[in-house]
């Protein structure tokens, strides 16, 4: 029995991602084998893992048992009798949980992927003509938000990093440095939870923090609301301030930048505006889609971008969508965005959502039971902000009612949210959406046809069904014309693997996911 489990675990470790293996397979243990009845019992540490392993991995483990003993084996999954007495330990602030550590270890490999992707794009920027005439501006803006900077400071700031900068910014300068930069010192790489969904973006961010103005300029991060784009760019700024305390850094939301342009125009203060923004070492601009339709803002940002890149200063931009799909942005700016590295941040996978909840609970001084974390993560899938909001509701509900945090209490605290979430994306809707996207018939999803123009969309639909629904592999296979669960597993792994290597496929999947989520 133990020999089989060592063999089975080794095979599954090769087949699964590190996070999946550590989260689901490693905690299992064989507890009994009845040779007469050919029955193998495997124990799981808690009810959630028991149910999940039964639905997702029982078929594969049963196949491996049959191959090992050369006869059919009835694999039964049972709850560890000690499970009821266990509580999940508080997640350490550093290092992160095992699943997250394994994903973070993949960052080094992701750095190589980032470099390869960038090299494949080729260098150089196309030449641009002068910007078009500015549109008329309104005056509904906030005060011009520029820290003071005299001519001598501006001249001194036009250099790249200098060795003596750290000494000049030591001691009491720290608070004023953060005030000028608008950075949030809490948002660092250390407390950024890493998983498959964001490891490439994190790898690129670390490269930029280590080599500002050299590695990827600009760095463009895009993805939906609440996925960690703002956290990452603050982490870059904070890391750079640690390494180069004298660096001139500015984080600004695109709406505030628009307001600054408006006020500079009203006050005829564009010289001050340009002197400040053109002299930065690092400009972090969040949600650039808010530049849409604002011609004068785009013109001024174009000038700032050109000046910063020419001075080997780093520019980092975020958006909710792929650069070429942002409406109302001048093509010349789009070409500039595209000249650097563009990386997507996807919604977090299950293991990553659990790690986020455990980490957040630990930071609040709460020892969150693992079953509760898995329950919340299983039902809330869209983004980190939603997870954190749900956790706050649970903590408040527990405090107000003076009750321990259990799954039952969690259901009560989140009943309104869970009601909304239960209106789930259906496999049928996924099939129709993917069929429309790739111009094939919905019937092709169930057919046995294998031409590439049909098989590929079908595999993509299977992948999305696994990612966006709670259906098991056998259930998904049944909805795709009665296919075996191993066929679905192959499709899921194939698309997941290619997604990390193929930018076009990743973009198509991003569009499909956003469409399905409404």
Curated annotation (Swiss-Prot):
GO BP terms, alphabetized: DNA replication initiation; regulation of DNA replication
Keyword Translocase among UniProt keywords: no
InterPro entries, per the entry: AAA+_ATPase, Chromosome_initiator_DnaA, Chromosome_initiator_DnaA-like, Chromosome_initiator_DnaA_CS, DnaA_C, DnaA_dom, DnaA_N_dom, DnaA_N_sf
SMART domains xrefs: AAA, Bac_DnaA_C
Subcellular location: Cytoplasm
Chief location bin: cytoplasm
Spans annotated as Disordered: 155-178
Alphabetical UniProt keywords: ATP-binding, Cytoplasm, DNA replication, DNA-binding, Lipid-binding, Nucleotide-binding
SUPFAM superfamilies reported in the protein's UniProt record: P-loop containing nucleoside triphosphate hydrolases, TrpR-like
Residues binding ATP: 226, 228-230
Region feature Domain IV, binds dsDNA, mapped onto this chain: 399-518
Region described as Domain II: spans on this chain: 72-181
Region annotation Domain I, interacts with DnaA modulators: where it falls in the sequence: 1-72
A single GO cellular-component term on record: cytoplasm
Region (Domain III, AAA+ region): 182-398
Recorded GO MF terms: ATP binding; ATP hydrolysis activity; DNA replication origin binding; lipid binding
Described function: Plays an essential role in the initiation and regulation of chromosomal replication. ATP-DnaA binds to the origin of replication (oriC) to initiate formation of the DNA replication initiation complex once per cell cycle. Binds the DnaA box (a 9 base pair repeat at the origin) and separates the double-stranded (ds)DNA. Forms a right-handed helical filament on oriC DNA; dsDNA binds to the exterior of the filament while single-stranded (ss)DNA is stabiized in the filament's interior.
Family the UniProt entry places it in: Belongs to the DnaA family.
Domain notes: Domain I is involved in oligomerization and binding regulators, domain II is flexibile and of varying length in different bacteria, domain III forms the AAA+ region, while domain IV binds dsDNA.
Subunit structure: Oligomerizes as a right-handed, spiral filament on DNA at oriC.
Protein name as catalogued: Chromosomal replication initiator protein DnaA
Organism: Paraburkholderia phymatum (strain DSM 17167 / CIP 108236 / LMG 21445 / STM815) (Burkholderia phymatum)
Organism lineage: Bacteria, Pseudomonadati, Pseudomonadota, Betaproteobacteria, Burkholderiales
